[in-house]
Every structure is written in structure tokens, then in C-alpha cells.
Amino acid sequence: MGLTGTTLVLVCVAFFGSAAAHNCQNGTRPASEENREGCDYYCWNAETKSWDQFFFGNGERCFYNTGEKGTCLNGECHLTTSSGGPDDTGDNTPPPTEKPKQKKKKPKKTKKPKRKSKKDQKENF
């Protein structure tokens, strides 16, 4: 195999390698992964003879086989529908409640002294 044959083989390997890598890279969903639940998928790496993990891009739709749907964010499927089970936030704090509004107390009216009747006024003299 001469220099031309070796070059041709290397070009073919580079082309097919880049085509395979194009189907398996972070942020893109290969056609073969349309029905993949969650936000990650695996592609075979012939060089390392192992599976490489990749993630769908932020904003990609995701789902679980239970029927729950969501959106990928940082490699995790954040659900937009609920199964009625615990949520994925891990925060068990109840939602804040509003403090009941207090009624304003009306100021007490000062009582005016009773006017003495004429009879009472005469008795004091």
C-alpha cells in the first residue's frame, strides 16, 4: 500500500469517525434516541471499546416511561407534569402562607362626663 492508499484509508477513517461522533455529542439528539427517556444517552466508542455518556441540550424535551414529561436542564429531566409522587427538588418545606391581616382597632372614644341633672346640682349647694 503506497502513500496514496494510506492517505485514502486515513481520510476514510477520519470521515467515518467524524460522522459517528456527530451522532453522539452533547446537546444533540440522534434520531436513534428519539424514544430515550431522561436526558442522557450512550454511544459506543470503538477507540476505547466502551460506552460514552452524552447529554441532551438544555431545553430539549424529555420524558419518562411513566408518562411524565419535562425539559432537560444540565443533564437532568425537570418534570413539567406530576405523577402525584414526591417531586425532584428534595425540598420538603411547605409553601409560605400569608400572615392573616389584622383588623385595625378603632380608638376608644373618651366618654364625656354626664351632665348632672338640675336636681343633683341643687343638692350640692
UniProtKB/Swiss-Prot annotation:
Query: What are the protein's GO molecular function terms?
Result: toxin activity
Q: What is its main location?
A: secreted
Query: Where in this protein does the record put region Disordered?
Result: 81-125
- Tissue specificity statement from the Swiss-Prot or TrEMBL entry: Saliva (at protein level).
| General remark | Protects mice from FeCl(3)-induced thrombosis.
- Function of this protein? Salivary protein that promotes host fibrinolysis via accelerating host plasmin generation from plasminogen (PLG) initiated by tPA/tissue-type plasminogen activator (PLAT). Does not affect urokinase (PLAU)-mediated fibrinolysis in the host. Enhances amidolytic activity of host coagulation factor Xa (F10).
Output this protein's name.
Ixonnexin
